[in-house]
Amino acid sequence: MLLTFGLLARHMGHEQFALNATITALTNLGVQICGLGSQESLVRRVAQDESFYPEMLGHVHILNIATGAVLILIGLVAIPVFFPISEDPMVTFAATGLILVTNIILLKIIWLATNSYIAHSNFGGANKLEMLFAALRMIAAILACTVFGITTVAEWAVWNFAAHAIAAMAAMVAISRLGRPKFTIVREEIPLGLMFASQFFFKALRGNADILVLTAVASSEVLGSYTIARRLMEASYMAVEALNRILYPGSAAAAVQGLGRVFERAKRMLFVATGIGLASALFVWLITPLLPVVFGAEYASLSWINRSLCWAVIPIAISATAFEALGASSLQKVRAKITNISSFVGAGVVALAAWLVGIDGVIASFYALEIIIAVLAWRALSRVHAETTKPQTDQAAFAGSIHAARAE
């Protein structure tokens, strides 16, 4: 992934690379809405009862197609107006269409395959699909940049679409091996899916507000450097994310036996996730001197931005353990309340900091928000656990409140 990113940054130059980052930030918002959180529902429900897979697969397909079509139409209207890719309107329209289909529809198909295998606890199959996807994108970037010498967003859109299309076809074959879908809407999962999707939409909004505002107030070099540093920090989180994905089905199954079991798993995972986050941050900090060689000397701000931002993975890893436990316990309302409010407010804080202070304000607000979210997430999980361990006379009342929270 980093090789792909490095090739694009070097060969596009900071102006086209910054434009690509801005459009990608917008599609990141769309992909969180696409499907209305149905893939999380699939993982959770199938982990608890594999016989329910056909219904959940059909549920996901219906919601992905319906919401994806709407999002693509919106993007085709908005992106060419605010972020034209080329002086030629036809090139802009065609490239925008390819980007939207790639970053929303095809990406959702690939994610569906990996999530389906995770739901069946087939982590080897999920990892193979992700490795294939990463390899295809890397091959596309190598060919596009070093052989064909692409330099624009429009040119990369074609190559990126091709890589995603091949990966999506492989994903569909992989999905077919698990069983055929039964096309139906699982109505009770719609509210939970919306809660889940809203969390990641607002999180993506907060995570991309900085890029969108920096587009207006910072140079393309600073925006490009910040985008690279953000991607490095996010890549360093992948080990923690992989651990979460492996443990999530087990946590969902444990939730059937009570929230106490999930809380104990989360406490054990907290130490592991924090350790992995610390090691990942240290690694990114140590490789900083190599970044100008990899991405190009024109990204003059990259080194100091990277070393300032890389440690943010630690509070992110800490909060993720609590959020995964809440999600596995079907307490999406509790999780969504924390995520949505903090992300909505955080998006405004980050945008204001970017507008008033620039890149320094973005980095400072990023740390402050992630630390606050980690504290709130663990406080909520601890409160839920404390209530479940109350004396027997109090548990009946609390059980009703938990049931209501899950149902809403």
Predicted features and spans:
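Interhelical loop/hinge segments that connect adjacent transmembrane helices in multipass membrane
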Residues: 124, 149-160, 166-207, 246, ...
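Hydrophobic alpha-helical transmembrane segments
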Residues: 22, 94-98, 127-177, 344-345, ...
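Interfacial segments at transmembrane-helix termini and the short loops linking adjacent helices
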Residues: 15, 81-99, 286-314
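Membrane-water interface segments that mark the loop-to-transmembrane alpha-helix transition
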Residues: 23, 28, 32-80, 91, ...
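Hydrophobic faces of transmembrane alpha-helices in multi-pass small-molecule transporters and flippases
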Residues: 61, 65, 97-101, 124-131, ...
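Signature of the first transmembrane helix
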Residues: 1-39, 194-221, 347-351, 366, ...
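Helix-loop junctions and terminal segments of transmembrane helices
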Residues: 5, 34-51, 119, 229, ...
